[in-house]
């Protein structure tokens, strides 16, 4: 299925895909320039998230970033012809992407240098038969939870709908991205007068409390401020304007995508919050944005990847879908996607299976999924010794139960990359009495057995509709990853 959409390319301020370092003889000016680099990268990241309301949009935007840097898209169902120095990428389901760069020298390739993030974030997915009416007045959207979001953060804020449409055309079924780019709906709270116990804690029922209000089906857009009864309207039908077709989600999506509603045979639509990311804090030292988990890491990986040239390793950048719901899909980390692509790379370079296995044995994976920073109001929730902070640099994550793949050797490698890039790093481990979440690393390495480290960028309010992170940390990740991918 081919995706068709017009998506702006995310670029640096100078219009290129590459960053130019500025150096002067004035240490004060150098410090200003370094701070400007941090802010510029953070702003680019926020813009990337703004134009990526769903996993489909994120992957399409990553594709645009890759193509701006000279990458060629390959289709999995076609034969590949790979060349030394080639820069390639392929997508699966329009929601996962793997890019790779082959060194200029084919002889002496040592292995794969890989990093992975994910394209999805917790949100509400819109069900089939998406519209529910209440007492012939309200039109609600029929939704379900996608991932483990903080439910209360989705209430009483402007929301909209985006995703992918499956459109029938003369050549079969075509995927079409859609984003209803306006304040469209809201999930309203119950007033405190109707629930006096609300501030003591509310357990939200997703089928009852969390359905978005989309429209008033009784609304007359010709005479919105006049009330008249149905009998009077019927008696004076000839004097009334022609009835307007009531708004529906499919009609809105079709209009936005520029297709006939009758040609839409399937949808993958999600709610997203309309709040745009911004820098906040007394000195602009924080970033506030939806979907920082994990589009902050996905952006940092892509930016570093497009600005790197390998020497002895094949560089690989993977952004998987469905991490928030277990990764168990054909486009998730718990699939053969990564393994399939690595094997096809080896075949395209005429490497035999023994050579491929030797490459895998000398490979390394960085799994990048954001990490919990120490919370200012609840510092006791963090481990007493491993305490990452916003703007403190890359977080190396450890777990005795192997939910994170980090071990002593892989941690040492990551620390070395950070030190060579002059990037600070921190460590994270769960409190021993608090269970943590899972991520990509151990799932990916179950299919491709390589040494791996789990890292993340520190953030607060993970899985909230809007999350908080450090302004400096995206640039820190870019610098460390460029060091890794430069080998």
Please place each PLM-identified region on the residue numbering:
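N-terminal hydrophobic/helix-forming segments and targeting peptides
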Residues: 2-14, 18-487
């Amino acid at each position: 299925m081919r995706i068709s959409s017009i998506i702006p390319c995310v670029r640096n301020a100078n219009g290129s895909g590459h960053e130019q370092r500025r150096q002067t003889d004035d240490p004060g000016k150098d410090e200003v320039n370094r701070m400007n680099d941090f802010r510029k990268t953070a702003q680019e990241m926020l813009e990337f998230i703004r134009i990526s309301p769903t996993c489909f949009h994120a992957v399409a935007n990553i594709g645009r970033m890759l193509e701006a840097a000279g990458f060629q898209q390959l289709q999995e169902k076609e034969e590949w012809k790979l060349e030394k120095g080639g820069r390639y990428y392929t997508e699966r389901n329009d929601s996962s992407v793997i890019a790779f760069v082959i060194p200029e020298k084919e002889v002496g390739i040592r292995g794969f240098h890989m990093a992975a993030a994910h394209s999805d974030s917790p949100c509400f997915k819109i069900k089939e038969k998406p519209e529910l009416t209440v007492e012939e007045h309200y039109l609600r959207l029929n939704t379900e939870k996608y991932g483990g979001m903080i439910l209360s953060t989705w209430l009483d804020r402007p929301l909209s709908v985006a995703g992918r449409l499956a459109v029938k055309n003369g050549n079969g079924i075509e995927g079409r991205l859609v984003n209803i780019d306006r304040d469209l709906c809201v999930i309203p709270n119950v007033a405190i007068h109707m629930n006096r116990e609300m501030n003591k804690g509310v357990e939200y029922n997703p089928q009852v409390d969390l359905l978005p209000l989309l429209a008033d089906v009784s609304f007359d857009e010709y005479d919105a401020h006049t009330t008249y009864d149905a009998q009077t309207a019927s008696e004076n039908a000839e004097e009334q304007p022609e009835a307007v077709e009531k708004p529906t989600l499919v009609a809105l999506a079709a209009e936005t995508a520029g297709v006939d509603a009758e040609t839409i045979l399937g949808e993958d639509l999600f709610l997203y919050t309309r709040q745009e990311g911004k820098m906040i804090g007394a000195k602009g030292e924080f970033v506030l944005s939806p979907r920082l988990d994990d589009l902050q890491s996905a952006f940092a990986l892509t930016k570093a990847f497009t600005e790197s040239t390998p020497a002895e390793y094949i560089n690989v950048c993977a952004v998987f879908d469905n991490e928030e719901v277990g990764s168990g899909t054909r486009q998730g980390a718990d699939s053969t996607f990564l393994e399939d692509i690595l094997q096809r790379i080896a075949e395209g370079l005429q490497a035999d299976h023994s050579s491929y296995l030797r490459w895998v044995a000398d490979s390394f994976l960085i799994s990048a999924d954001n990490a919990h920073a120490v919370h200012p109001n609840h510092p006791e929730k963090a481990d007493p010794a491993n305490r990452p902070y916003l703007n403190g640099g890359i977080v190396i994550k450890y777990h005795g139960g192997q939910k994170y793949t980090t071990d002593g050797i892989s941690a040492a490698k990551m620390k070395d990359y950070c030190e060579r890039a002059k990037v600070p790093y921190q460590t994270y481990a769960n409190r021993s009495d608090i269970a943590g979440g899972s991520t990509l690393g151990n799932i990916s390495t179950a299919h491709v057995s390589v040494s791996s480290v789990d890292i993340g960028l520190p953030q607060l309010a993970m899985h909230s509709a809007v999350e908080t992170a450090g302004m400096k940390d995206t640039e820190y990740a870019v610098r460390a990853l460029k060091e890794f991918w430069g080998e």
